Amino acid sequence: MKELGLKSYRFSVSWPRVISQDGKVNPKGLEFYSNLVDELIKNGIEPLVTLYHWDLPLWQYKKGGWLKKDIIDDFAFYVKAVVEALSDRVTYWITFNEPSCFLMNGYMQGVHAPFKHRYLALPKFTKIFMLTNRRAVETIRKYAKKKPLIGLSFASGAFIPNDESDPKSVEEAYNKSFNVTMGTMNNRWW
């Protein structure tokens, strides 16, 4: 990565590798990520940590996953463990990678795990997700050892105008990129 000239590197921490089924922190899991952060910094590469990239622990799934409020406290416990281990060296935190994908595709369209078709559950899992994200942000701010910069990573697409000199073509590309992609794929709720 250093030879390629990368200035930053985004990676995801695996919740099931950090928190065991019995709710205990796995020191070896955290050590792996701590070593990764050290190596990145040693090579002049800024670490960007993603806390959730669709890897719901099996034990959490069995408790109900994104349809049960238990996930709010469980995720906050995981976030606290990661932040306490890495925040002395990490500034950039992404709470969730592409929430529309794991929620809409997993719980409505059934094309991603857990392959559910629960259209009527949309308000419920959306609310639980938003509360979980809020708690994650609060947890990062509370336990971070240096001032954190926090955000979400959204799924999106980019459209290029057919003719960059034509304002109508530029506007059409913009609308497809932001109003359709960001509005439909990510839903204004996120």
Regions found by a protein language model. Give the residues of each.
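Non-catalytic scaffold segments within catalytic domains of secreted glycoside hydrolases
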Residues: 2-7, 16-190
